[in-house]
Amino acid sequence: LATAADGTMYLLSTTAYSATLYRVEEDETLTAVSKPFSGSMYNPKLVICDGTAYVLYQDYDYISHLCKWNENGQLWEECYVGTKLAQYQDLATDGEQLYFTCTTGSFPYALQAYCYNPNTGQATQIGTDLSGNACNMEIAAADGTVVIGYRDLTANSVPKAAIYNGATWNIITLSEQECGMVSVIAEEDGNFWVLPSGGKNPIFSMSKDGTATAYELPAALQENVFQMVPVLSGGNLYVAVNSQNPNAFDLYRLNQETASWETVGNTIANEIVNQPVLSARNGTIYCMYNASEQILLKKLVISKNEETILKGDLNLDGRRNLADTVLFHRYLLRTVTLTEEQGKRAETVEDGTINIIDLIWLKQVIHLADVVDA
């Protein structure tokens, strides 16, 4: 399950011997957009980059494959094939390039990261190995920054984050507690969320320079989390918490101002779920998961009063700051475009247009906030 930059949502359905890409229509019907893939895709990861669907998967021998659906040629096209066993792997895109991480070889698992350039068709390793033995990692990318959250088996299984800004990896130990899985998600401005599961680990909001802010989980969830599945919608962080407890699989929302959590909507499932994935579009959150030998897709419509629209918050991080003014300047200079959601927030004066007047209003509000804080 993946959502493109234009809001179009796609779903990859796999069987033991085939796979088909579908578009999830506005009425939740599925339209096949690819021919069936011939072969097996194990543990597939789907992303949409510049309108093209890419899938990272493992074959029967746990070798990594990156392929794409070639719309013009109406065929599945292989982009990259690994040469060593890859027990763990994950895929992300910043909208221009693809980034994937994988472990190589049998135990111990060396952790590596690669960048695939769709224009050249070449995949190159990013820097050097991140760890001599790691697992349970995820990767995210935005605004020129790449982050990998992983469980470092060389350091008592603690959660770590590796941040790459185009030069070197900055590796940060997030906690001294053991963790299980580590999930990550990127905001449009290149800031990230890193969510280690297990123990009493908090989750972390991280900036490009590695500065981390911790948010504790509710007491009832501490030491009871198998996996956290994040998604961003309307400037808010939502997390589906998988405890592999048949009593509840719930969705939570973090209130950053109060550092508190609240459940959202009804319980997603009252059974043990596997391979849950979240995606969001147009104020609706979708969850796909495997349970009782079925693949299920459910949705939750976030009401207007729950989705707070913060005027001027162009990068959707829940705050108005210098980063928003920089993005606004770039938009006025026509070096970037805004999504529909960003456009709603850019029209601060509400006169039917987005122009310099809206930017002036934003700068004044930020200045007044700085004066009050001082």
Question: Positions of the model-derived regions?
Answer:
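Short loop/beta submotifs within extracellular cysteine-rich repeat domains
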Residues: 19, 30-31, 63-64, 75-76, ...
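Entry beta-strands of beta-propeller and related beta-repeat scaffolds
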Residues: 7-11, 51-55, 96-100, 144-148, ...
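Blade-level signature of beta-propeller repeat domains, shared across WD40, Kelch, NHL, RCC1
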Residues: 272-306
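Trp- and S/T/G-rich repeat-edge/linker motifs of beta-rich repeat architectures
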Residues: 20-39, 68-84, 115-131, 163-177, ...
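Structural motif
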Residues: 17-22, 61-67, 107-114, 155-161, ...
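Repeated scaffold domains used in trafficking and secretory/extracellular systems
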Residues: 1-4, 39-48, 84-93, 132-142, ...
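Cellulosome-associated attachment modules in secreted, modular CAZymes
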Residues: 305-374
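Beta-strand C-termini and the immediately following turn/loop, strongest in propeller blades
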Residues: 12-16, 56-60, 101-106, 149-154, ...
